[in-house]
């Protein structure tokens, strides 16, 4: 590997003080020696910054992976054993499950390597290195460019940087903007695509508490699943092959059974997906009043349609389990955001900061560049408030009815097919679409798909403003009966059944393709989604927001000292910490952990959310917990830290000061749901499943001691 030479450019990070406060912040590993090491060690870290992040030597970052693009996981054995959340592995596990072998419901533990199962599609991504390319990227743009011209120029430079650092395709290279395009860094990754399912607890352990307990504390969810990374015989990434071997890990985490006490040091490495802490007060107002309410309503509409079919048929429930869980998660999140942003008066706090910024912006030396920034932002949001609701009704229609956005892509491919003179190209297109549609058919249930399409299209037609003329005509023609319309459309479309598609391919024609009703709906709705705002309006906002962020930093008005999350590897550190007592968390003062006993208090035999294996009750009565008991004599299940996380951190390893695994992050608390916009030092918490409970579930309850034996256990 080439030695990385850091850019010695003047950057935000290099100008920061050498000590940063803990708790708040999603920090770049590249800068922790300069910015965080001293503070972390003062609070209990027993490692050096080099032991956390090193380019040329093995460090903790080599044991952390992005899991399937949306979660985090960690390597916990020399042979590539990977642990993440149950809800992160949910889709892969559901895809492997059948009514006869329902791994999702019943759980599963591979007895040996031959029983480790390959999901249809799963990968992990290792972080290799990063560097600052701000000067290079900004040298290709200027203030006279439109936003499209600017982005085109940036994209061209990104492609060059990616090519220069991919080493002929060995690595995946991503150039990412930070601080709203005021800084740029590139990231080098290596992907491994042979990842096999090793085991998971039963669903009534991995999802104990269900939607009711989601985002809540106290919590008792055994939210974990286990996989393994495989490589070719030389240790390189390779597609699935029975000849592949378990990865020989460069670095893996030791697992400790010592447990935690309140105020113990705790740090998390992971891939937080997205935060919006630099947004203006206008953004907060728009989301609370328009955007989030539409999301909540549209999510619930899709969930109700889905659940009606899931409740009638176990096979259908399996097909839709992962999609339903995703919808339910965001539904509760968005409602929690509305409540938290309102309760904490977040918009008012933003307005107070903007008043200070306005004073600075209107100073003679700043006015030319920053004088109009706040008014430009205000104008944009005034003009787009209703559009925020329209956008989310439309977005959730696409999420509910997957065939619509998929059909749009198929039409493009089939047009190429019809115009191609190459038999080889035509065969490749035909096989590719057939394979994708087969996956759709196997994961879908036609009556449910019809209702999802109909109900969310009706909601959009009834609630959105400025709907396309074609949708208004359908509403009028069918007197608002979108289920009748959907049934007719699905009967006629070439994409909705395998038989219809094969009939079309036996006699393909451009006329049939262009007149396909699903394809027509897709064209109309996707065009509306991407073209609802004028280029001038979008240009004005992007320029104003970029200047706003730059000005807030230059003026020192903002106390935020880190970039928003954007699915790049970050570190957060803090401590094990109780929540302030209230009725919501059982009015317990020292409530930083939960126990097996308090989990049994929630137990409801046969309940969809609070059932548990009968064996759990029997083992509790026998006190069959062995070495996994806490020194207080109880079995701890979950605990709290005040780390700063968001979506994408699911599955992240929570480590003590020695870098040993103490648990897995799997949720935040609803009291601090505004955390993506503003960090609440008093209430922000990370909910963690205790690694001792995880190991007990694998070893004692699951009978898979051989898996635990792979790990390095610290007694």
Swiss-Prot record:
Mention any Pfam family matching this sequence: Peptidase_S46
Which catalytic residues are annotated? Answer: 87, 223, 650
Recorded superkingdom:
Bacteria
Q: Explain the purpose of this protein.
A: Catalyzes the removal of dipeptides from the N-terminus of oligopeptides. Most potently cleaves the synthetic substrate Met-Leu-methylcoumaryl-7-amide (Met-Leu-MCA), followed by Lys-Ala-, Leu-Arg- > Leu-Asp-, Leu-Glu-, >Leu-Lys, and >Val-Arg-MCA, while this enzyme does not hydrolyze Gly-Arg-, Gly-Gly-, Lys-Lys-, or Gly-Pro-MCA.
MF terms per GO, please? dipeptidyl-peptidase activity; serine-type aminopeptidase activity
Q: Which Gene3D superfamilies match?
A: Trypsin-like serine proteases
Q: What protein is this chain from?
A: Dipeptidyl-peptidase 7
Native organism is Capnocytophaga gingivalis
E.C. number, please? Answer: 3.4.14.-
Where are the residues marked Critical for substrate specificity of DPP7 as a site?
668
- Which positions make up the signal peptide? 1-22
Q: Which InterPro entries does the record match to this protein?
A: Pep_S46 (IPR019500), Peptidase_S1_PA (IPR009003), Peptidase_S1_PA_chymotrypsin (IPR043504)
Which family is this protein grouped under? Belongs to the peptidase S46 family.
